[in-house]
Amino acid sequence: MARPGPGVLGAPRLAPRLLLWLLLLLLQWPESAGAQAGPRAPCAAACTCAGDSLDCSGRGLATLPRDLPSWTRSLNLSYNRLSEIDSAAFEDLTNLQEVYLNSNELTAIPSLGAASIGVVSLFLQHNKILSVDGSQLKSYLSLEVLDLSSNNITEIRSSCFPNGLRIRELNLASNRISILESGAFDGLSRSLLTLRLSKNRITQLPVKAFKLPRLTQLDLNRNRIRLIEGLTFQGLDSLEVLRLQRNNISRLTDGAFWGLSKMHVLHLEYNSLVEVNSGSLYGLTALHQLHLSNNSISRIQRDGWSFCQKLHELILSFNNLTRLDEESLAELSSLSILRLSHNAISHIAEGAFKGLKSLRVLDLDHNEISGTIEDTSGAFTGLDNLSKLTLFGNKIKSVAKRAFSGLESLEHLNLGENAIRSVQFDAFAKMKNLKELYISSESFLCDCQLKWLPPWLMGRMLQAFVTATCAHPESLKGQSIFSVLPDSFVCDDFPKPQIITQPETTMAVVGKDIRFTCSAASSSSSPMTFAWKKDNEVLANADMENFAHVRAQDGEVMEYTTILHLRHVTFGHEGRYQCIITNHFGSTYSHKARLTVNVLPSFTKIPHDIAIRTGTTARLECAATGHPNPQIAWQKDGGTDFPAARERRMHVMPDDDVFFITDVKIDDMGVYSCTAQNSAGSVSANATLTVLETPSLAVPLEDRVVTVGETVAFQCKATGSPTPRITWLKGGRPLSLTERHHFTPGNQLLVVQNVMIDDAGRYTCEMSNPLGTERAHSQLSILPTPGCRKDGTTVGIFTIAVVCSIVLTSLVWVCIIYQTRKKSEEYSVTNTDETIVPPDVPSYLSSQGTLSDRQETVVRTEGGHQANGHIESNGVCLRDPSLFPEVDIHSTTCRQPKLCVGYTREPWKVTEKADRTAAPHTTAHSGSAVCSDCSTDTAYHPQPVPRDSGQPGTASSQELRQHDREYSPHHPYSGTADGSHTLSGGSLYPSNHDRILPSLKNKAASADGNGDSSWTLAKLHEADCIDLKPSPTLASGSPELMEDAISTEAQHLLVSNGHLPKACDSSPESVPLKGQITGKRRGPLLLAPRS
């Protein structure tokens, strides 16, 4: 069973109390109902009521009505003649929230008494209020909207809006405000969201004038602001919309909008801006809309939009833009609407819209675009999502095949109000999504090239948007292209110009004159105009020559030629040039010819000669200017082989002017060439790098031990830079030079011949250059000659020499007399005109008794072994026969004074010919000779010319001389065969030949009166050695002559020191001159020089 609710169970208990309360209420109700729930007060006179709104506007009221109902929430007193407000009239309006007092004659902000506290919106526009008094606003504690526009307020001070106000929207537009004090709105910083200051007289905004962190909209349009300084709007952290249109702003300094990181919309239209740069837009990272129309913008700097990468809509209409360069719109990847209408754009660079991947609407109406559509391809590359393109009202006369390349997503294309005359085949074919194509032209050239267009338009259902009428040929003029039969589109002529001569790319040097030539042909008589473009911009004041002539082959075709002259070209003339030839039927564009202006390189830094020490760093500078910028290259000694490069000690920076070589070495020394080269030419400059090094010895000197009479050499191979000067010292003093001391060039080799005991000592090689001096030493030790004569007194030597000479002379003359008598018995002398040479007389004896050339070969052996020998008491140096084979190539003479007849102590030389034969040199007596004893390392090998075995016993002297010439070849050798012989050491003894010769000549002349078989001494002074043997020629003469010659020769052959000359043959017996001389003879032979 359910329990009863509490109300039911408790009803009996509450009934008395409830009844008592109801009784009291009924007793008091009549009084309170009369006071509060009486009848509603009527509307004020001359006002209308609508709900809780009381409308008293437009009544011409000069004073407030007295019967304003208390229930009024919205009171409209606008459009009256109120000049003052009686606050008492608002005493009972406790519900009042909106008060409209606009369009009256109030001169100050009125006070509404107690009702001011609840007023939320106060409209005071179009009055005559002169100022804003902060004290008058203190009572409006609930005020959120205050409209003071269209009054006569001239200034806003910091005291105008005291703290504590809750104004959210403040309108001060259309006043006369010219002074805007910094911090004037600080009292509203906590509440103000919208501030309108448009249509005032503000000329300058103070920096940080607005410290309103909650403000979202700021309207400053139609003022007189000329410049926006940086940080002007700092403090407006929440600003979203800024209106600055219709001012006189000509420049935005860098950071002008810094701090507006949340701003979405910026209005700058109708100002005087001339350019767009990134610095002025710095900080607008959240900007979505930028309105820049109706300015004077003529250029957009590179990266001008780099801080507006979230921009969705950009309005640049009604400006002075003439071209869109490749990077004019870079980094606007989020842009969806771009309006560029009503500019003067005539050139759109290829790739100008590259990167605008989000762009959907592109407005290019009312520009001067022609070539972009007629000639350029790829201008719209990158607009993959573009859906609408408007080119209404441009100067397009033809549409190229690839004009709209890259617009595959295009849906709306407007080409209206263009005098289009031709459209190339498939110009719109790639626009698969095209839904609207607007064309309106009455100038179409209806030839065979337009035949494709009508069926294509009808196939895509686009003919409704196209108004196209033929203008040529005359038969189709005025007809719509859709009504012309396909067979009527023919090409009987070519009224549109056709290029036949293209301008050519060229290169020029600064200051030269250049010209470009371009020719076209046309069958039309329509006037032709010529223009030249440079980098796709028309040259306004081009220096042109234009010609026209009738083509020879057909008189109906005209050829037109235009020549562009560029005089005294500079760098500013560089670019791509193109000619445009136009008539009524269209324009023809030539290829683009590039002009490159070059300047020969010239040095700004020239390398200089330097001299540095080894181990340091060499620094060579070289820099040059030119156009294009020259490339710098280095060479060493005309090549690219750098020792420093191989060793990684060379450093050349690509962008630096300095060439470094570290840890410099001698190998780095040379001439370094800096070459600056560009397409105009090249120039070079040389610098010599001299490496300085202290002297040093490359090969150390060694101590030497030699024997008396030998030759010793000291080699001092010095290195250093500059080349060291070498000086030889002995015992610390300058070396005393004699004829035995010889030097090679540079004194690096010192040779001492025939050394003597006095030559022993310490030899010093002193090497010096400007960097220092170095010394090297060598000790020379001299050993006495074994087996040769000992040191003795001069008197003893002289005595022994005299005795030996007398003995030898006697023995020699005994042999001579014996041989002479023996020969005289064997041969008889006939008194004929011919001289008969005995059969056993060798051919080197002439018919006139003179000694003819003996065919001898002298072989010098380098480095041969030294033969042992000793000197007998008679002064003859005997050799060991065991050391002399048949061909003696290693014979060595003893170091005995040499006697060469016909020579004085003057030195004599040998000149070696190119074929290794020796040429005789003259001595003091102008005769050639060979020393009687052989020098070291030299062997003499006689090679007598064999006598023809078939030769008859008698022969004429002419035949003998002919026979001698035939068997006298010059054999290669390293000595002399013509009587010249190189001394191995020592000087020559003095000769008495000058005294012997005249005596012998006289004797011979007196004895040979008839000239027959006489001993001619004309060549006596050229004999190498005096062979002390009987002469065959003397033997054949008279005994008196022979005896005189013997006595005279024996007397004069003594030298001044008392010694007789050494016999040429060291053997005890003489060998007769007959037959053929064999090679077994080991003694020296008589060497007779050639006559």
From Swiss-Prot:
This is Leucine-rich repeats and immunoglobulin-like domains protein 1. GO terms for cellular component: plasma membrane. Acts as a feedback negative regulator of signaling by receptor tyrosine kinases, through a mechanism that involves enhancement of receptor ubiquitination and accelerated intracellular degradation. Glycans are attached at residues 76, 152, 248, 294, 320, 385, 686. The keyword Methyltransferase does not apply. Residues 960-969 have a biased composition (Basic and acidic residues). Residues 497-596, 601-690, 695-781 form the Ig-like C2-type domain. The keyword Transport does not apply. Disulfide bonds join 47-56, 446-470, 448-491, 518-579, 622-674, 716-765. Pfam families: I-set, Ig_3, LRR_8, LRRCT, LRRNT. Keywords: Cell membrane, Disulfide bond, Glycoprotein, Immunoglobulin domain, Leucine-rich repeat, Membrane, Repeat, Signal, Transmembrane, Transmembrane helix. InterPro entries: Cys-rich_flank_reg_C, Ig-like_dom, Ig-like_dom_sf, Ig-like_fold, Ig_I-set, Ig_sub, Ig_sub2, Leu-rich_rpt. Residues 35-796 are extracellular. Residues 1-34 form the signal peptide. Contains LRR and Ig-domains that can mediate low-affinity interaction with EGFR. The LRRs and the Ig-domains are each sufficient for EGFR/ERBB1 binding. This interaction is abolished only when both the LRRs and the Ig-domains are deleted. Residues 912-990, 1059-1091 are annotated as: Disordered. The chain crosses the membrane at residues 797-817. It comes from Mus musculus. The lineage of its organism: Eukaryota, Metazoa, Chordata, Craniata, Vertebrata. Residues 818-1091 are cytoplasmic.
